[in-house]
Amino acid sequence: MSCRELIVLGCSSQQPTRTRNQGAYLFRWNNEGLLFDPGEGTQRQFIFANIAPTVVSRIFISHFHGDHCLGLGSMLMRLNLDKVTHPIHCYYPASGKKYFDRLRYGTIYHETIHVIEHPIDREGIVEDFGSFRIEARRLDHLVDTLGWRITEPDTIKFIPEKIKACGLRGPIMQDLLRDKQITINGKTLYLKDLSYVRKGDSVAVISDSLPCQSVIDLARDARIMLCESTYLEEHRHLAKSHYHMTAKQAATQALAAGAQQLVLTHFSARYLNSREFELEAKEIFPNVFAAEEFRSYSFPKNPPSK
């Protein structure tokens, strides 16, 4: 799985429509499948997207309103049916442990997969396992809700022409990486002079929330900011009373965060044309898309910092 992309499996809030399923979002990245907020019917959406559910390795639940978690149980059962051998990590607010258990054990089946739970009871870095660093922050919603920032580590890349000019090859390259310098024939060579840093990419996933500082912090310089925009500005009063955002508010948060790309989602069923969200947000933040089911949003590797 060498691709780097977000695939939208659903983008409706609260209830599905004839054209939009409840939300579910899959990031395929660094040989992992990161599934966020699987709503009702997510398992079936994988079929329509022509993606094997077995790519999923980590599941994130922002909060336990039904449209963000009702697909959890069926996804775990499907992975069990498919006999996946890799662990399935599940991240969710610790305060919702009883709801997680109800979803996981809501029906009779023989569980054979290895599910590793990560109930989150604090903000900040909640896991760093080499491929990614996972950060969680509390959002401003009606119930305990987490937003997520996923960041890959920076990597050091050698500059081929400089390495060749110095005649370096083989195990000594690992010595240079480890020690930051090596001495050959009385001459000291420094890693910083023979390499560059490729900054690790970040993505942010913002589910239900009013605009708040946590949203900006999570989305700071993110390659993709996936953000709820339940309402348009004409219904801003509903957004405020239900603790959601409008498309304009989401765009304003993306601009403040310096995000590179904004993907809007979680559209209220009252709106038939999601294009309206994109048009509203573009007035503030040009590089924006209204999520479309089964569409892929790619984020190729960042160019190196030489």
From Swiss-Prot:
Zn(2+) 1 binds at H63, H65, H141, D208. Disulfide bonds: none annotated. Its EC number is 3.1.26.11. Zn(2+) 2 binds at D67, H68, D208, H266. The active site is at D67. InterPro entries: Metallo-B-lactamas, RibonucZ/Hydroxyglut_hydro, RNase_Z/BN. This is Ribonuclease Z.
